[in-house]
């Protein structure tokens, strides 16, 4: 005898199937959250619930009966209490293979993949994958069929979690398929291909460079398909960020050599790539050879309109920029209205972290100049200064008016964003007592921080801060 809630769900499944009417989604979602070992231990539980679910999933009217896909959430929760061997009693090998590769009902395919995922660590599951060449066949579904997104996501999830030695061996059969896709040059298929290669590179050290190294000629060719070219550059951004165990020097050098040939949208993605490279020591040599930070390659920054050079100086590692162009301050930064032009202000914030450039900038970081900034800009600048010891020292020792008036004053800030910025600034200023000048301000900083954190009720009110447009 089933408990009351299980019986209610079973009745709803059977009635909805017979009448071809929508399930009680809220009922089933609530039930999914309650399933535990005591639920599934009820006599004949699996024998009643699973067939009732299967009848709906395999019915041609499944989209009518289960419009919210609640069964796709319910069934995995039930199956998680069974071993792979037990699951095969309800979903035999032939059933799984049939609905993965022959009769493709989207929801049933998703369930079959979920069955594999739930039991991937079991020897029987690995044997099933091996004996039936499942991984390789799934890849063919990805690249040669119109695979639904939900199924594609499950396939990619399956490949992502293959991390044992035996499991990785299963992936080796994928390489011939990947090579075929790579050589076809179909950008629709290559878009999926890039995601998969990104997953596999960490597992297959013998990966052929041809599979991940696109050529200069290909980059030029794909200019006719800028959306794919953006995806391709994002692919390299991910590989650099994840420190993929492969040599990317050649494709990265080719991308940078074509920087000026790309349109603005693509150049903006290259900026993201350059920024990532600048924070990765092993690729500094590529940036040096490209000369992308040399003054003659940054002339667009003076145009006072949004452009990729401004983004580049706002995002890349400022210390690396300086190391590759020692004249960056006198040649470029000194000629920009970093404080008053909104386009250039992110460049100022970025270069706060460079000790070398900061000592050239700090002559302009005085009480008078900072006091003239709108409050939103001032607090963003102070937040950046509060994250580096060299700029904290300058704030403590050379900006007493800013400290007293803007950070230690007791007047309520009625702008939510500014209030949160101030709280974060105070937290940062208090996190290192070794900074020269800290002791002088310590007591007042602590008092204000505690007052904001524990003793003041912040009332969300209309902003009273004047933010003016200074892009001219």
From Swiss-Prot:
InterPro entries the UniProt entry points to: HSM3_C (IPR040752), HSM3_N (IPR041335)
GO terms for biological process, alphabetical: DNA repair
Subcellular location field: Cytoplasm
Any Pfam family matching the protein: HSM3_N
The organism's place on the tree of life at top rank: Eukaryota
Record key words, sorted: Chaperone, Cytoplasm, DNA damage, DNA repair
Cellular component aspect of the GO annotation: cytoplasm
Recorded family membership: Belongs to the proteasome subunit S5B/HSM3 family.
Protein's job: Involved in DNA mismatch repair in slow-growing cells. Acts as a chaperone during the assembly of the 26S proteasome, specifically of the base subcomplex of the 19S regulatory complex (RC).
Descriptive protein name: DNA mismatch repair protein HSM3
């Amino acid at each position: 005898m089933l408990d009351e809630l299980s019986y209610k769900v079973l009745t709803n499944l059977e009635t909805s199937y017979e009448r071809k009417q929508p399930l009680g989604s809220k009922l089933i979602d609530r039930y999914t959250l309650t399933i535990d070992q005591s639920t599934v231990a009820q006599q004949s539980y699996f024998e009643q619930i699973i067939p009732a679910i299967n009848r709906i999933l395999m019915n041609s009217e499944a989209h009518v009966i289960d419009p919210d896909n609640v069964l796709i959430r319910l069934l995995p929760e039930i199956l998680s209490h069974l071993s792979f061997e037990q699951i095969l009693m309800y979903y035999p090998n032939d059933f799984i293979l049939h609905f993965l590769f022959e009769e493709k009902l989207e929801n049933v395919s998703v369930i079959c993949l979920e069955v594999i995922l739930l039991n991937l660590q079991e020897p029987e599951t690995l044997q099933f994958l091996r004996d039936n060449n499942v991984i390789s066949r799934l890849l063919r579904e990805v690249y040669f069929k119109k695979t639904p997104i939900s199924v594609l996501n499950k396939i990619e999830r399956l490949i992502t979690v293959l991390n044992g030695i035996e499991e990785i061996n299963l992936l080796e059969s994928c390489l011939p398929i990947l090579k075929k896709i790579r050589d076809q040059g179909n950008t629709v298929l290559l878009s999926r291909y890039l995601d998969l290669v990104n997953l596999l590179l960490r597992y297959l050290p013998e990966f052929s460079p041809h599979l991940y190294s696109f050529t200069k000629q290909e980059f030029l060719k794909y200019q006719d398909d800028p959306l794919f070219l953006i995806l391709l550059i994002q692919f390299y951004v991910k590989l650099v960020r994840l420190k993929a165990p492969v040599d990317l020097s050649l494709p990265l050098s080719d991308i940078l050599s074509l920087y000026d040939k790309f349109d603005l949208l693509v150049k903006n993605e290259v900026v993201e790539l350059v920024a990532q490279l600048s924070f990765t020591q092993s690729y500094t040599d590529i940036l040096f050879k490209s000369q992308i930070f040399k003054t003659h390659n940054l002339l667009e920054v003076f145009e006072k309109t949004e452009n990729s050079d401004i983004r580049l100086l706002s995002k890349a590692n400022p210390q690396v920029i300086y190391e590759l162009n020692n004249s960056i301050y006198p040649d470029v930064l000194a000629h920009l209205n970093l404080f008053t032009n909104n386009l250039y202000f992110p460049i100022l914030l970025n270069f706060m972290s460079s000790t070398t450039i900061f000592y050239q900038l700090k002559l302009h970081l005085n009480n008078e100049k900072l006091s003239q900034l709108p409050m939103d800009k001032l607090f963003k600048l102070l937040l950046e200064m509060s994250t580096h010891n060299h700029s904290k020292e300058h704030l403590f020792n050379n900006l007493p008016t800013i400290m007293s008036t803007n950070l230690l004053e007791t007047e309520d800030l009625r702008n939510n964003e500014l209030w949160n910025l101030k709280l974060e600034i105070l937290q940062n200023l208090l996190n290192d007592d070794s900074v020269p000048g800290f002791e002088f301000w310590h007591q007042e900083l602590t008092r204000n921080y505690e007052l904001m954190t524990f003793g003041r009720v912040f009332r969300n009110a209309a902003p009273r801060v004047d933010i003016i447009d200074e892009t001219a």
